[in-house]
Design a protein with these regions (language model features):
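Phosphate-binding/switch region of NTP-binding enzymes
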Residues: 13
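C-terminal accessory helical subdomains adjacent to catalytic cores in phosphodiester-
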Residues: 1-7, 16-44, 54-186
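Conserved SAM-binding loop
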Residues: 10
């Protein structure tokens, strides 16, 4: 895989999402050095932080896009909402800030794990998961890097288009989002 130097911003809820996204990008061949920035919720409601910061990051992405190659990666848990409801909330945040909705040609990728990112990790570890479960899957506090070998497996499956048919629907949607954005970043 070739090395790609792109200004990348990751907007996410927590450390687990950050580790997941960084490792995924690295395995896809992106160089994450000084052209990389993470916006992560310091404390409190992570999804609220992402929703509130999203419009600001889109404005910055659009302001910079003619100067350099950039990409905005957004991770936000669906929690008890549907993926579509969470995406609509992000659209609404743009509208409230007098911004156009995300356009197909923009290098803005949104990944919405249903319940939480841990649902995806448990699935990748071989656990049967239920995105409709009443309680979210337990976090890997202070062991966020446990996801790395499973992220590598996911990178290969998404890239080759052979994600298992019983994969969680939100993970299938994420692979679709990845396939949408990859041609844009060359």
């Amino acid at each position: 895989m070739s090395q790609r130097r792109v200004q990348i911003v990751i907007l996410c809820e927590d450390k687990q999402q950050e580790v997941f996204a960084i490792h995924f990008l690295q395995k896809r061949g992106f160089t994450l050095d000084r052209n990389f920035r993470t916006e992560i919720c310091p404390k409190g409601a992570g999804e609220q932080f992402v929703r509130e910061k999203y419009a600001q990051e889109v404005v910055e992405y659009r302001r910079q896009r003619n100067k350099r190659s950039g990409m905005l990666i957004v991770l936000i848990d669906a929690d008890k909402k549907t993926v579509e409801e969470r995406l609509k909330q992000l659209d609404d945040a743009l509208i409230e800030n007098a911004q156009e909705l995300r356009q197909p040609h923009e290098k803005i990728a949104i990944f919405v794990p249903k319940r939480n990112i841990e649902t995806w990790i448990y699935y990748l570890q071989g656990t049967n998961v239920d995105e409709q479960a009443e309680k979210p899957y337990p976090k890997f506090d202070k062991n966020e890097s446990i996801c790395k070998p499973y992220v590598e497996q996911l990178v290969n499956q998404c890239y080759q288009g052979n994600l298992d048919e019983n994969a969680p629907p939100s993970l299938k949607a994420a692979c679709g989002e990845l396939q949408r954005i990859l041609p844009l970043i060359g």
